[in-house]
Amino acid sequence: MLAAMAGQAYARDVVDMMGRKVTIPDDLKKVYAPSPYGAYMMYAIAPDLMSGLMFVPKDTDKKYLPKNLTDLPVIGGVGAGPNANPEMLLKTGTQLLIVWRAEPNPITEQTTALLDKTGIPYVFVSATTLEEYPAAIRYLGTLLHRENRAEKMAQMAEKILADTAAAVAKVPDAQKPKVYYAEGVDGLSTECNDSIHVQLFKLTGDVDVHRCHTSSHMGMEKISLEQVMMYKPDVIVAQESMFVQKVYTDPAWQDVKAVKDHRVYLIPRVPLNWFDRPPSFMRFLGLEWLTNKLYPNQYAVDIAKETQRFYSTFLGIDLSDADVREIVAQ
């Protein structure tokens, strides 16, 4: 997709993932991604090129992120989070914007108008599903001159997709567990099975018990405890630690099969959520984690070692065994 601009050492023409031809500086030193999708991918591929952050990382997350990130200024975003500060973009010397395109969010005229107003060249990178991520990773690797690093990530991602798919394929549909996705501190918000927020359920056998058409991109569909009980989930995967801490002692939940069987699992979320909100490259590790939880015999990997390997490859962080225990609390 990328082609150097002949005769000009200071600039090159590239074609972004929406087919737009863009002229960008060849010697990139300051790059900014004004959305969580792109910002998180920059954490992985080229944290040294980042000119700023969308928001300040939580203190609990900082030790698991590239060290230079914590000193960067907060610039804001386009379409998510606080609006980007044009003056800060200029002050930081930002040379290129990485704009992530993910379904079902279209790139609107308002968005492009905001981007054009900055006067900074921008490229669109497109990936929604995990299957689309390796191509986006390789694209960014070429764009940012990080080909070797990006290739290692893309190959790891592809291997995870292939290995987990092979494990899931060994299990007959009738033997696949029914899974309820508990969101919110009460556990009574969830996602329809067609939501982008539950792609990991699709990849592990389409196991989401809440079969419906999602009412909005934001999701968080409200549900009653009675409905959860009717679903008879074998497993509950939860976002909130407060819910997991109380579910085994809350009388109202004691008749739910997953609770009876002690199969309620808290999704790891340090430094980025492994599952959702926002969906990021961390979902590859989340896919391994979930496949191992649902099919421990078919996907009998050592999640602690996989976690160390993944954080090393994608975040450049070497985790101790104690770090892994802290991250993978369940």
Write out the residue ranges for each language-model feature.
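Extracytoplasmic substrate-binding proteins
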Residues: 11-14, 21, 110-189, 218, ...
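A ligand-binding cleft/hinge motif common to bilobed small-molecule-binding domains
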Residues: 103-117, 239-254
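Sec/Tat signal peptide C-region and signal peptidase I cleavage site
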Residues: 5-11
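Short helix-initiation/N-cap motifs at beta->coil->alpha
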Residues: 17-19, 75-87, 214-225
